[in-house]
Amino acid sequence: MSAQEIIRSIEAEQLKSNLPEIYIGDTVRVGVKIKEGDKYRVQPYEGVVIARRNGGINETITVRRVFQGVGVERVFLLHSPRIDNIKVLRRGKVRRAKLYYLRGRVGKATRIKQRFDRSL
């Protein structure tokens, strides 16, 4: 076995199997585990998926939302143990792989049409 095959086999054990199908433009709610003292709690983060990168264990999504008039983006490693759950709330209809143009828009211009042909 080559080194790459060994690495892939080890990474395959770490991949999460309960992830939903996530597409660009979807509105998702990501449950992030946060440690406070010796306790853990799950903090939800809701927004629009504007980018997906990499694959396998390094796969990430960038989620954008507007909080108190300021755009906030977070990058989540999909297979990280800090991600408790991901729920797709809405499917978006877009024609781009990266929605970075939303950064320059404000108000109603940031809305994305809903897509009904894919199930949640």
UniProtKB/Swiss-Prot annotation:
UniProt keyword Ribosomal protein, yes or no: yes
Q: What does this protein's UniProt record list under function? A: This protein is located at the 30S-50S ribosomal subunit interface and may play a role in the structure and function of the aminoacyl-tRNA binding site.
Per its record, how is this protein called by name? Large ribosomal subunit protein bL19
Task: Quote the PANTHER family the UniProt record gives.
Answer: LARGE RIBOSOMAL SUBUNIT PROTEIN BL19M, RIBOSOMAL PROTEIN L19
One GO CC term, this protein: cytosolic large ribosomal subunit
**What GO annotations for molecular function exist for this entry?**
structural constituent of ribosome
Enumerate the Pfam families for this protein: Ribosomal_L19 (PF01245)
Q: Which organism is it from?
A: Trichormus variabilis (strain ATCC 29413 / PCC 7937)
Give yes or no: UniProt keyword rRNA processing.
no
